[in-house]
């Protein structure tokens, strides 16, 4: 069935000329039931003429080669690709033909490789494309002149007959009423570049320059397209386009040059004045003075704007303004220099290294002493730079003239000095440990006051004077007096709170003073946490703990209660090993630090009671009774240098853990070593005095693991103490 249908369709195509050498025109038979090759029952009187008229009305775009019609021009453009010799788009300059408009557009760029991308140029290109499209349509209508019978086809053929009173543009085929309008149109769109010596015009500046060199022998600057158009020539010089059968695609100015071989030379136009402001170094010109001023900064390293706080220099004033926010937001408005202050130093070229500004403003450190009227309240700038007045003391005493180095009445704290000024600290390790302890105590109180001076150690450390070895309270009081902190009040800049949280070296901000203290070790190179087994030294206690657990865990477990070969850092001195003079005895087993009695707190209930023992926080502490205080599990060095009240340091039997609180040891055993503690029968030789040693021949009691074990622990302690008394 499918083989018989093409034969029938071919029979219907016999009256019309064959297309594509006998190929089937399937598009003719896909128009619906109304348009068909065979008249249907709905159209009994439809003949060949009616069918052709309906088909021509629906398909207005015929192919100029084969006569095939299409509904849309885009389909016709795709169809024209099948004809290799028929190209619808022709170049007006060289006659090149292209099947697609995009290909012709790319070809037109070869004639104008350096065409300026101006609005007028884009409009000219668009007009040329419209002219090409119009020519293509007229060519198709002209080729199918006899076949067009519809009014739409006649409308396409009407533009071929120009009116006698119209002036056409030779480029875009535009019609104008008068010749002046056409000349104005040519000057704006097609001939923006006019020769001032003759009537030559061009659409490109290069063509006008070439014309000036060849015809007139002088290169003069052409008139821009925005200049005032010249008056149009008289109408008799321009031939009427209505008398011409075909308008010329491009005018030829050669006859004009031959007619005027020797024109009178006009005075050459003066070149436009160059920009007023020119750089004397590179020759670049500018239209405004401030452009040249900003450009001249590139040729010289001018750092005219210096920071009065840290000494950094900037090229622009707004850079300095933004930089000053770092200081003013923390210090408040800077005060004017007093009469005794030294004159400002001249700005110097900045150093790229931040280490060059380690002293933080040598001009301020070397400044003379302030006037006596200004010594009542230390300025906030000195607090920011870690500089303390050498003669101002809260207790009214004067500064020691030989206690340390002073620069003009101001003594810089050791953290503001270079590293080489602190090398003598290693010669006195004992004094350094005591000073660090005082520093840690001052941090706990200085953090609430928000003072930067509590960050630094005692100035007596840098001068070689030993710190007082009194109790904790006396040491912290002395540290506050040295740093300028009153017991009953605060300093003037203590209310600012954020003064001591900025690094004076790099300007970084930190949330707490401890983080700033750890960060300052990066600049100072200080590594206070040293390993007792090797040469490792760290800036943080956590680094040393990790190092000891990773590399020296076996050495720590086998070391026993003996002292290490080298004193550990202050953060772990009281938690890793006891003092050399401390010996584990039964009498030193105390439950609470500072308890007068050597007996552990007995339970309020009987031995068989299952109630919990009394809370450790309600026991006596420091000889004071009737107070409910929380349990203090921290370790502090007593007046005699012992860890805890009696020097008791409780060590775990199964791991290197050590603590001064028996409750914490019991909790540690319950959490980590409950099963191992139950199966343990023989204690080690260095058993901690936390649990009283049982008489010979008896099994030592297990540590308190549950609530039932608490009374047992009390009974064992009572039995041990009773045996000792007997």
Curated annotation (Swiss-Prot):
Residues modified as Phosphoserine are 16, 696, 702, 710
Enumerate composition-biased segments (Pro residues).
262-275, 561-571
Note the InterPro entries from the entry.
Answer: Krueppel_C2H2-ZF, Znf_C2H2_sf, Znf_C2H2_type
PROSITE patterns, alphabetized: ZINC_FINGER_C2H2_1, ZINC_FINGER_C2H2_2
Compositional bias ranges of the Acidic residues kind? 428-441
Composition bias (Polar residues) maps to 473-482, 572-589
Primary location group? nucleus
Q: What does the entry list under GO cellular component?
A: nucleoplasm; nucleus
| Ranges annotated as biased composition (Low complexity) | 594-608
Q: Which Gene Ontology molecular function entries are recorded, alphabetically?
A: DNA binding; DNA-binding transcription factor activity; DNA-binding transcription repressor activity, RNA polymerase II-specific; RNA polymerase II cis-regulatory region sequence-specific DNA binding; zinc ion binding
Name positions with the PTM Phosphothreonine: 699
What are the boundaries of the region Disordered?
Answer: 139-164, 218-278, 391-498, 545-645, 674-726
* Tissue specificity field: Highly expressed in primary chondrocytes, heart, pancreas and testis.
Q: Name one GO biological process term.
A: regulation of DNA-templated transcription
Q: Basic and acidic residues composition bias: which ranges?
A: 249-259
Q: Which Pfam families match?
A: zf-C2H2, zf-C2H2_7th_ZNF462
What does UniProt say about this protein's domains? Answer: C2H2-type zinc-finger domains 5 and 6 are important for the interaction with SOX9.
What quaternary structure, including any partners, is listed in this protein's UniProt entry? Interacts with SOX9 (via C-terminus).
Q: Which family does it belong to?
A: Belongs to the krueppel C2H2-type zinc-finger protein family.
What is the purpose of this protein? Transcriptional regulator. Recognizes and binds 2 copies of the core DNA sequence motif 5'-GGGGG-3'. Binds to the HMGN1 promoter and may repress HMGN1 expression. Regulates SNCA expression in primary cortical neurons. Binds to the COL2A1 promoter and activates COL2A1 expression, as part of a complex with SOX9. Plays a role in chondrocyte differentiation.
Recorded protein name is Zinc finger protein 219
Species, as recorded: Mus musculus (Mouse)
């Amino acid at each position: 069935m499918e083989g018989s249908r093409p034969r029938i369709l071919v029979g219907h195509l016999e009256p019309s000329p064959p297309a594509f050498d006998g190929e089937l025109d399937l598009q003719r038979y896909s128009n619906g039931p109304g348009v068909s090759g065979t008249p249907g029952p709905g159209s009994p009187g439809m003949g060949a003429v009616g069918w052709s008229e309906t088909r021509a009305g629906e398909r207005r775009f015929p192919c100029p080669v084969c006569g095939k019609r299409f509904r849309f021009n885009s389909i016709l453009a795709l169809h024209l690709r099948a004809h290799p010799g028929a190209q619808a788009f022709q170049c007006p300059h060289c006659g090149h033909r292209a099947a697609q408009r995009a290909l012709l557009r790319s070809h037109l760029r070869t004639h104008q490789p350096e065409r300026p991308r101006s609005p007028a140029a884009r409009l000219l290109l668009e007009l040329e494309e419209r002219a090409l499209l119009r020519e293509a349509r007229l060519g198709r209508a002209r080729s199918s002149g006899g076949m067009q019978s519809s009014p739409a086809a006649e409308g396409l053929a009407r533009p071929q007959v120009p009116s006698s009173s119209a002036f056409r543009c030779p480029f875009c085929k535009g019609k104008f009423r008068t010749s002046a309008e056409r000349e104005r149109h040519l000057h704006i769109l097609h001939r923006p570049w006019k020769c001032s010596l003759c009537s030559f015009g061009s659409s490109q500046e290069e063509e006008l320059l070439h014309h000036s060199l060849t015809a007139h022998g002088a290169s003069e600057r052409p008139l821009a397209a925005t200049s005032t158009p010249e008056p149009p020539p008289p109408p008799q010089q321009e031939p009427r386009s209505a008398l011409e059968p075909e308008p010329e695609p491009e005018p030829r100015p050669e006859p004009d040059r031959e007619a005027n071989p020797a024109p009178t030379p006009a005075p050459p136009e003066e070149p436009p004045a160059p920009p007023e402001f020119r750089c004397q170094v590179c020759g670049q010109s500018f239209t405004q003075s401030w452009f040249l001023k900003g450009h001249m900064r590139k040729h010289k390293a001018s750092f005219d704007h210096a920071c009065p706080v840290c000494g950094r220099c900037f090229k622009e004033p707004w850079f300095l303004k933004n930089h000053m926010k770092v200081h003013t937001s923390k210090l408040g408005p800077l005060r004017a220099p007093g009469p005794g202050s030294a004159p400002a130093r001249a700005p110097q070229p900045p150093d790229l290294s931040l280490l060059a500004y380690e002293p933080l403003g040598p001009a301020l450190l070397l400044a003379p002493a302030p006037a006596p009227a200004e010594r009542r309240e230390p300025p906030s700038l000195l607090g920011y730079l870690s500089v303390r007045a050498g003669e101002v003391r809260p207790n009214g005493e004067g500064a020691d003239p030989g206690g340390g180095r002073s620069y003009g009445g101001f003594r810089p704290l050791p953290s503001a000095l270079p590293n080489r000024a602190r090398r003598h600290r290693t010669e006195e390790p004992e004094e350094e440990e005591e000073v660090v302890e005082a520093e840690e105590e001052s941090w706990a109180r200085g953090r609430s006051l928000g003072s930067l001076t509590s960050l630094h150690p005692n100035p007596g450390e840098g001068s070689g004077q030993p710190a007082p070895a009194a109790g904790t309270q006396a040491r912290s009081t002395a540290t506050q007096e040295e740093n300028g902190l009153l017991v009953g009040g605060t300093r003037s800049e203590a209310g600012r709170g954020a003064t001591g949280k900025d690094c004076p070296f790099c300007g970084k901000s930190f949330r707490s003073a401890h983080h700033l203290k750890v960060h300052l070790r990066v600049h100072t190179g200080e590594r206070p946490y040293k390993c007792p087994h090797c040469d490792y030294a760290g800036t943080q206690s956590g680094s040393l703990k990790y190092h000891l657990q990773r590399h020296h865990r076996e050495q720590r477990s086998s070391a026993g209660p003996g002292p290490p070969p080298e004193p550990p850092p202050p953060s772990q001195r009281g938690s890793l090993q006891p003092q050399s003079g401390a010996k584990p005895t039964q009498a030193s087993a105390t439950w609470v630090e500072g308890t007068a009695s050597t007996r552990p707190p007995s339970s309020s209930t009987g031995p068989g009671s299952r109630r919990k023992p009394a809370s450790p926080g309600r026991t006596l502490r420091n000889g004071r009774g009737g107070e409910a205080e929380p349990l203090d599990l921290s370790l502090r060095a007593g007046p005699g240098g012992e860890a805890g009240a009696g020097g008791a340091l409780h060590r775990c039997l199964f791991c290197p853990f050590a603590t001064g609180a028996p409750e914490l040891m019991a909790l540690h055993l319950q959490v980590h070593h409950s099963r191992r503690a139950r199966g343990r029968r023989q204690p080690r030789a260095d058993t901690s005095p936390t649990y009283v040693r049982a008489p010979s021949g008896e099994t030592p009691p297990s540590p308190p693991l549950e609530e039932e074990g608490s009374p047992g622990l009390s009974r064992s302690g009572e039995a041990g103490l009773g045996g000792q008394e007997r």
